[in-house]
Amino acid sequence: MAKRDYYEVLGVERGSSEADLKKAYRRLAMKHHPDRNPDDKASEEMFKEANEAYEVLSDASKRAAYDQYGHAGVDPSMGGGGGFGGGAGGANFSDIFGDVFSDFFGGGRGGGGGGRGGAQRGSDLRYTLELNLEEAVRGTTVNIRVPTLVNCKPCDGSGAKKGSSPVTCPTCGGIGQVRMQQGFFSVQQTCPRCHGHGKIISDPCDSCHGEGRVEESKTLSVKVPPGVDTGDRIRLSGEGEAGAQGGPTGDLYVVINVREHAIFQRDGKHLFCEVPISFTDAALGGELEVPTLDGRVKLKIPEGTQTGKQFRLRGKGVAPVRGGGAGDLMCRVAVETPVNLSKRQRELLEEFRTSLENDESHSPKASGWFEGVKRFFGDL
């Protein structure tokens, strides 16, 4: 069966750029990859066809030969040169398939694990710091103890016993990866001998057993700025795990969690609290002390105050950590009904109730409520 034109296979024009070729090939590889189409012979053939087309068109010399002579210019069976051996002059599919595999499995090829040999950055650490509301609002300094990995002192992080040193891996030549030939294309894999490090330790350190790092807990002083809230993070640069083979140390992220307060609730820069008052103070008005984070302040209660009435104390909230003026303290009134009354108190309340009978002028909502009840039952 005659071969299709390589440009047609990839769905591109003859003058397409290298970037366009790569984009087209990647799209086809994603669509027809065997991992996505198991037992689908048609997709398998399309996948192979796309591989063959891209290997030729991504190589400048092969592309020039193909453009001039067609398939005969690149197919040795037809008298052409080159072929599809995937040798030194062949196309390198590893970069493309790094992206393809990333899309398959949700991650790239980078990171602290494998990758190319040599120094590797240490992992970042996370520490949850519990604070009370006062500490979060005012700021504080806290000492924390964090388990981590540090460089082994006897071998100075090399992993090799004192007097010896790691040697270059003969399998990968210190790169940390090896090229594997798979059909028409080649991919790079982590070296199975050095596990991606590029070095081999023949005489490992007795303290770290060749790892170059050991577990240790260290105490750190964390300065918490005023105004932090739950979810805020403080970054301590260079306080994460030590890097492998002399790589840079990771960072430590201290994540703030503010505990619930017995009196105040926080919403951003504003605070809220409930203030209980007697029904006599609510009816007659008065003055009472309410708590704030700065101490007690006096709050004037007008006569006839109802449950749910909210009073705003400006500037008595929280000054945000990222700047700006302090929020407010919102005090919600809750009128308390007296209990455990004495005989005299009951008598006085009975007299008071009698004096209010048939007089709705003293109730701010009664008339409207009773009218609503009448309409409700009238509609039934």
From Swiss-Prot:
InterPro entries: DnaJ, DnaJ_C, DnaJ_domain, DnaJ_domain_CS, HSP40/DnaJ_pept-bd, HSP_DnaJ_Cys-rich_dom, HSP_DnaJ_Cys-rich_dom_sf, J_dom_sf
CXXCXGXG motif repeat spans: 152-159, 169-176, 191-198, 205-212
Cofactor(s), by name: Zn(2+)
Compartments reported by the entry: Cytoplasm
Molecular function in Gene Ontology: ATP binding; heat shock protein binding; unfolded protein binding; zinc ion binding
Boundaries of every J domain copy: 5-70
One GO process term, biological-process aspect: response to heat
Keyword flag Repeat: yes
Keywords of the record: Chaperone, Cytoplasm, DNA replication, Metal-binding, Repeat, Stress response, Zinc, Zinc-finger
Zinc fingers (CR-type), renumbered ranges: 139-217
Source taxon at top rank: Bacteria
Cellular component GO terms, alphabetical: cytoplasm
Keyword Zinc: yes
Domain notes: The J domain is necessary and sufficient to stimulate DnaK ATPase activity. Zinc center 1 plays an important role in the autonomous, DnaK-independent chaperone activity of DnaJ. Zinc center 2 is essential for interaction with DnaK and for DnaJ activity.
The family this protein is said to belong to: Belongs to the DnaJ family.
Subunit structure: Homodimer.
HAMAP family per the UniProt record, alphabetical: DnaJ
Function: Participates actively in the response to hyperosmotic and heat shock by preventing the aggregation of stress-denatured proteins and by disaggregating proteins, also in an autonomous, DnaK-independent fashion. Unfolded proteins bind initially to DnaJ; upon interaction with the DnaJ-bound protein, DnaK hydrolyzes its bound ATP, resulting in the formation of a stable complex. GrpE releases ADP from DnaK; ATP binding to DnaK triggers the release of the substrate protein, thus completing the reaction cycle.
Protein's recorded name: Chaperone protein DnaJ
Organism this protein belongs to: Pseudomonas syringae pv. tomato (strain ATCC BAA-871 / DC3000)
Gene assigned in the entry: dnaJ
